[in-house]
Amino acid sequence: MNNYHFQEHHLLLRDQVRRMVEKHVAPIASEIDENNRFPEELVEIFGDMGLLQLWVPEEYGGPGADLTSVCLVKEEIAKVSESAALLAANNSFGLILPILNFGTEEQKRHYLGLSAKGRTLTAVAITEPGTGSDVSSMKTRAVQDGASWVLNGGKIYITFGSVAHFILVFARTSEGKGANGISAFIVDTKTPGFSFGKEDRKMGIRGVPNVPIFFDNVRVPAENMIGPEGQAFKTCMRILDLNRPTVGATAVGLAQGAIDVSTAYARERNQFGRPIAEFQGIQFMLADMQMQTEAARCMLYDCTRMADREEWDGFSAKASMVKCFASDTAMKVTTDAVQIFGGAGYMRDFPVERFMRDAKINQIFEGTNQIQRLVIARHMLHG
């Protein structure tokens, strides 16, 4: 594998994660999918390695990792389990990035300090029954009452919603202002009036709990608002820009994992008296799978280098390109992996059908790939 612009600390981190994955993640990857089980035992392991709190700066007790580090971690873990990869850097979207970019110093010291301990899980609550890509149409309301805000409404498909300690909730705080009337709040899930529903029955990422969540007069201190009132859409877009490359990293890892097992299988599977790897048709499939995945990887780490150097001009479009291209690649590569396995690929005895089921979500969450193409086209046309 090309080492791109990786520095020594990136390579050391990658090697450490690779060893951890072999020891702790690979042995349970199929089981957590089969049993629809959240791998709670990985929380402590990831936390002790600093993988939950990667983006917490050193001044607040964290590793102070950059985007390249986060993506390397996700790529390595996703080679065997996307569910486990989604747990890594769990706090980034729900707590660390919003507070780093928009929080007060008091919020940073409190919440980043908690995250740095490596035991805090978070979630983000944006999507509602009538609100997916159109964030501006959300119905969840927050009404100010003295020194508090009172939340009412509900969200759906909330990743880690049943296990999170804190949830970043987006709610409308003023009427008639479109996206500008939305604010963001950190909600402690122990707060009275907060509840979650039955876990969603999903095609893939079955080791990750997704649930609907509900707010029934949930009272949140005013100091838990992140950023200026009514400006959370800007917060959301900024965080999504930084998070989308991590989806690309997960997709690249998933694709590479599918390639690795397909290559090994093609060497071992015999038909017509020889390994199927000797047939040109299989060789062409494997070559295309690796070319596409390597192209996605090159795009990914070019994007992370931009972020690490704080080169923000054009970054939003590049992040959308990475997310879109890598997830489309993972979907195609994992489908081809199933085809190489033939009938065996359709069976749960082999991981490629799980890889294919897991791959689909990357084309949907963090903004659908249709939305990504809109972002890219608008950048091309309007700059």
Predicted regions located by residue number:
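Short Ser/Thr-interspersed hydrophobic loop/turn segments at strand-loop and sheet-helix junctions
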Residues: G50, K74-A78, A171, V187-P192, ...
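Flexible, small-/acidic-enriched active-site or ligand-binding loops
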Residues: S137, K190-P221
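Long, acidic (Asp/Glu-rich), low-complexity accessory segments flanking structured domains
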Residues: N217-T235
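Helix-loop "lid/cap" segments that line or gate small-molecule binding pockets
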Residues: F93-N101
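Short Gly/Pro-enriched turn/cap motifs at secondary-structure boundaries
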Residues: S115, G130-S133, Y157-F160, T173-G176, ...
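Alpha-helical interface subdomain recognition
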Residues: M1-V80, A84-N90, F102-Q107, L114-R119, ...
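A short, Trp-centered hydrophobic/proline-enriched beta-strand micro-motif
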Residues: G118-I126
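A short core secondary-structure module
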Residues: S148, N152-F196
